[in-house]
């Protein structure tokens, strides 16, 4: 029986400084809204917002098929290279490691679609941190999505004690 039978959502914030990674993630099976979003996202680029396949290396896309999209406008070539280089590699490796480790069942990988929203700060400079943090945040997002975490009861319980690092009163 399939483990991932519906669209699931994951989120994670990892790292610090301008290289912080904040991932918003959707995973779902063939025939689901995740597949539709994947196809639409791949062909509907807008100025400053570009979607791209997550590839481990050129000619080696990760499986499940994974589409990355930027969450803030890409303003210059440096920021584009960070998205198409360290962030892309980190995301792709996280997806493939999730398959290798059984988080995503290998027998389902060819029939799933993953969409990953990536944040690249306009002043990010350390490519190694960008790659590392995006890897960690993507993998954590996948784990949370596949496991249906956090549960509504946990969010409700922690809603007043949790702190948001960018909130007005942080």
Swiss-Prot record:
Q: Entry's InterPro entries? A: HCHO-activating_enzyme (IPR014826), HCHO-activating_enzyme_sf (IPR037075), Ribosomal_Su5_D2-typ_SF (IPR020568)
Enzyme class at the top of the EC tree: lyase
- Which residues of this protein are catalytic? 22 (proton donor)
What molecular function does GO assign, one term? carbon-nitrogen lyase activity
State the GO CC annotations.
cytoplasm
Q: Name one Pfam family in it.
A: Fae
Is Magnesium given among the entry's keywords? no
Tell where it localizes.
Answer: Cytoplasm
Quaternary structure and interacting proteins, as annotated: Homopentamer.
Q: Which family does it belong to?
A: Belongs to the formaldehyde-activating enzyme family.
Chain's role = Catalyzes the condensation of formaldehyde with tetrahydromethanopterin (H(4)MPT) to 5,10-methylenetetrahydromethanopterin, a reaction which also proceeds spontaneously, but at a lower rate than that of the enzyme-catalyzed reaction. Is an essential enzyme for methylotrophic energy metabolism and formaldehyde detoxification of this bacterium.
Protein's name in the database = 5,6,7,8-tetrahydromethanopterin hydro-lyase
Instruction: Read off the lineage from the record.
Output: Bacteria, Pseudomonadati, Pseudomonadota, Alphaproteobacteria, Hyphomicrobiales
Q: Which gene encodes it?
A: fae
């Amino acid at each position: 029986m399939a483990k991932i039978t519906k669209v699931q959502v994951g989120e994670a914030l990892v790292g610090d400084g301008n290289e912080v990674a904040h991932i918003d993630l959707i995973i779902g099976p063939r025939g689901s809204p995740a597949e539709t979003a994947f196809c639409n996202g791949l062909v509907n680029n807008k100025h400053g917002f570009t979607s791209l396949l997550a590839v481990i290396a050129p000619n080696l896309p990760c499986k499940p098929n994974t589409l990355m999209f930027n969450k803030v406008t890409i303003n210059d070539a440096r920021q584009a290279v960070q998205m198409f280089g360290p962030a892309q590699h980190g995301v792709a490796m996280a997806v493939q490691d999730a398959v290798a480790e059984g988080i995503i069942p290998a027998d389902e990988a060819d029939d799933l679609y993953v969409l990953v929203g990536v944040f690249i700060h306009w002043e990010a400079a350390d490519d190694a941190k960008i790659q590392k943090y995006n890897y960690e945040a993507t993998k954590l997002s996948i784990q949370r999505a596949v496991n249906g975490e956090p549960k509504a009861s946990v969010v409700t319980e922690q809603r007043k004690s949790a702190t948001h690092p960018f909130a007005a009163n942080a």
